[in-house]
Amino acid sequence: MTGVRVAGVGLTHFGRHPERTGRDLFAEAALAAREESAVPPDDIEAVNYGNFMGALSERQGHQAPLMAEMAGLQCPATRYEDACASAGVAIREAVKAVRSGEADVVLAGGCERMTNLSTAAVTEGLATAADELYEIRAGMTFPGAYALMARAYFEQFGGSREDLAHVAVKNHDNALPNEYAQFHRAITVDEVLEAPMVSDPVGLLDACPVTDGASAIVLVSDEYAEAN
């Protein structure tokens, strides 16, 4: 097996982009990754695209070939759907393809466009990643699921809402120097604790936001990198 190197990365700003389509967002990230990598488009042998909500938020199935086309590529393109891990799985499979020698160059990444939907529609859409028979029919939402997990953790290991609040504070602090982050505002533990409750003990500032954005990465084999 060969080693795998990162040749280029690209990101969009994450936030509300109601005027843009998912394929437009992914094209921005993919073109940025291509530019940083300096890999000729004809050398890219596959596009691995991760997406969960596209069929719901944009009524668009069979997305991967459209994403490849928008990125200026003509090669096999595959969509990976694994809920919140969709783009991560797309990248993992790209690494496996390069390591195994199946390909020398793969562009991988993902995109979600969600802010064109109402909060209720996004919540319902995200809930489809849960078990339809035993969770969705019982009214389970993902904030509710994580609230149950947090309560179980507190019961077994100890902990409190204040401990969770420090995680939110840390996350906002990490976003401050990141130009692509959705929020650029420091928050305090008190603000987290005083925010509206979503599903006890998960409050508004504990929960992940709805957002639009895309990212992409160009992976190459050691042999390709050394030859180019």
Language-model segment annotations:
Residues 1-23, 32, 132, 166, ...:
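Condensing-enzyme catalytic core mediating Claisen C-C bond formation in acyl metabolism
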Residues 81-112, 143-177, 217-223:
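Active-site-proximal alpha-helical scaffold in enzymes
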Residues 17, 54-105, 113-145, 183-209:
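Conserved catalytic cysteine-centered active-site region
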Residues 151-211:
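Internal metal/ion-chelating core segments
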Residues 1-85, 93, 153-160, 182-188, ...:
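Conserved active-site "lid/cap" helical segment
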Residues 19-26, 45-54, 105-110, 122-126, ...:
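Short, mixed-charge, low-aromatic patches
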